[in-house]
Amino acid sequence: MLMITSFANPRVAQAFVDYMATQGIILTIQQHTQSDVWLADESQAGRVRAELARFLENPADPRYLAASWQSGQTNSGLRYQRFPFFATLRHNAGPFTWAILLICIAVFILQNLLGDQPVMIWLAWPYDPSLQFEAWRYFSHAFMHFSLMHILFNLLWWWYLGGAVEKRIGSGKLVVITVISALLSGFVQHQFSGPWFGGLSGVVYALMGYVWLRGERDPQSGIYLQRGLILFSLVWLIAGWFDVFGMAIANGAHVAGLATGLAMAFVDTLHGRKRA
């Protein structure tokens, strides 16, 4: 299935769905924070988007009202979740987003049960030449977190940004961003502080950079990050360099992650800009 658009007003969404039904195209609505309109037959996407553009120009056109009457529906056709908060958590993230989130939680529980050191011995960046062929270590450092605030902050951003990328662009793209940014941010942080570090923040900063620049250069992608949030991330980044918070922060990983995300977004939007 392909998500076509989202409407803040569920009645407007229903009007568009009703009209498309009269054109022989079946759309469905999933109600979460907004009314998401989905298309099952992706081969019809071009026609649906063309009709959507006309609909948005004048949603009050009588033909749309007539379509709603023609559908014979006296209700909105929407199904509301009994627990909308949990429905939002579930539907705003894909399987890879949830897999990483659950792995991080499981590792955090192990750290609290066994202590940080035993877990780091297995998951930390290679701290001895004999470990350099243990390939998982170049990525598994991202699963470790050292305080409740640390893991909550990272996983909230991971769910918000990673979920958006996975839902709008696909799991493959999120996997690529995660793997590349974990590797590069880990390498840079290792140069700064040695192998004893952890956290998903390098990947999170990569997602911040990717989502913001991809949204600026390619609005059609459906992902974006408000400029206020990217400004907040930059302030947090600068504050970390000057030790404003008085705690150990993986500044090298943050900078490397952000640069990685920006670079990947630039490359992904380069061809589209050239065609334009």
Swiss-Prot record:
Spans through the membrane: 94-114, 142-162, 169-189, 192-212, 229-249, 252-272
Keyword Hydrolase recorded: yes
Gene3D superfamilies: 3.30.70.2350, Rhomboid-like
Membrane protein topology class: Multi-pass membrane protein
Record bears the keyword Protease: yes
Location of the protein in the cell: Cell inner membrane
GO biological process, one term: proteolysis
Stated family: Belongs to the peptidase S54 family.
UniProt cross-references to HAMAP family, sorted A to Z: Rhomboid_GlpG (MF_01594)
Described function: Rhomboid-type serine protease that catalyzes intramembrane proteolysis.
This protein's name: Rhomboid protease GlpG
Organism, as annotated: Klebsiella pneumoniae subsp. pneumoniae (strain ATCC 700721 / MGH 78578)
